[in-house]
Amino acid sequence: MNKKDYYDLLEVSRNASTDEIKKAYKKLALKYHPDRNPGNKEAEEKFKEVTAAYEVLSDSEKRAGYDRYGHDGASGGFDFSQAGGDFSDIFNDFFGGGFGGSTSRSRTKRSTTGVSGADLRYDLKITLEDAFKGIQAPIHYVTNIKCNTCQGTGSEGAIKPVQCNTCQGSGRIRTQQGFFTIERTCTTCYGEGEIIQNKCKKCGGSGRKRDEVNISVSIPKGIEEGAKVRVSGKGEAGARGGKSGDLYVCVKIATHQIFTRNRADLHCKVPIRMTLAVLGGEIDIQSIDGAKIKVKVPEGTQTGTKLRCREKGMPYMNSHARGDLYVQVIVETLNPKNLTQKQIELLKALEEEEHESVEQKSEGFFGKVKKK
């Protein structure tokens, strides 16, 4: 998944100081906050983007990793996006909980449990034939899955978590600094609002463990290079009962030996004899589905000419229709080493006739030039 540059999102240079980054974020966060743009999905998405950028660039370690390795370095080596994160947590560090309705939950007991898992990306390479017919692709990857001992709760046995005394179950801590009220995530319960007294020995209280996942993903026919197939709930498991993220399978199509692709159309180059190009005829070629088709070559076909075979290309996504196949003919020059004596004599005779014809045309042409 393509990600925007964090410095560009915050409209700062790569040498910007921490204070400059904070000021830039504050300005943009106020501009795009959902409470100031009700119903504006574009503004909401922009708010999430600048908040994600600030979360990385305001942290010296994450910023160093991002500067060196890009988005992978900022996320600890994994290529995922934390789509389920609560961006208002970071926003509240600047403005407290009184900006608007979307941050009011920080003043009351948390109604949600756990932390949502991250979305994951998996690059899958398939053949053009696979993309033509569609396949069930077996894939495997390693991620955090739900702990089967505690069933994702993080607690050992039937003992339930208790309310955090530090934040009184809100998951947030407020501190007064002059005229400003600063609100931050509770460092005792890490924003959960509750404490696990008897942690699961298998997962250490996180509710998840590291393991390999094996699944089969349906790749539809007609899929194009770079397309993403979303597998709901197959991303990283949420912590302590949180919602699992999604898996995005990014399709890469291997280069084909014969065909090139442009959307649903296919293109190929086919060499033909000089005599066939002159006299016309038919050639047999094999289409992407393995079937043989006859392609008519008109008389006098020149090298580079494209012959169209309707509905012999790739299928359109979610449709029974197909694109076209374009056959570009390449007229081969005869090699005298591969010709018989009779063939050479016939070519010489043809050349003599052609030479006389060309001379007559040349004389007529230059005669017109002289008259002018």
Curated annotation (Swiss-Prot):
Record: residues binding Zn(2+) 2: C164, C167, C186, C189
Annotated PANTHER family: CHAPERONE PROTEIN DNAJ, DNAJ HOMOLOG 1, MITOCHONDRIAL-RELATED
CDD domains cross-referenced by the UniProt entry: DnaJ, DnaJ_C, DnaJ_zf
This protein's name: Chaperone protein DnaJ
GO molecular function per UniProt: ATP binding; heat shock protein binding; unfolded protein binding; zinc ion binding
Subcellular location: Cytoplasm
UniProt record similarity statement: Belongs to the DnaJ family.
Quaternary state and interactors: Homodimer.
Domain notes from UniProt: The J domain is necessary and sufficient to stimulate DnaK ATPase activity. Zinc center 1 plays an important role in the autonomous, DnaK-independent chaperone activity of DnaJ. Zinc center 2 is essential for interaction with DnaK and for DnaJ activity.
Keyword Membrane: no
Functional description taken from the UniProt entry: Participates actively in the response to hyperosmotic and heat shock by preventing the aggregation of stress-denatured proteins and by disaggregating proteins, also in an autonomous, DnaK-independent fashion. Unfolded proteins bind initially to DnaJ; upon interaction with the DnaJ-bound protein, DnaK hydrolyzes its bound ATP, resulting in the formation of a stable complex. GrpE releases ADP from DnaK; ATP binding to DnaK triggers the release of the substrate protein, thus completing the reaction cycle.
Main localization of the protein described in the UniProt heading: cytoplasm
Cofactor(s) recorded in Swiss-Prot or TrEMBL: Zn(2+)
Occurrences of domain J (ranges): 5-70
CXXCXGXG motif repeats: 147-154, 164-171, 186-193, 200-207
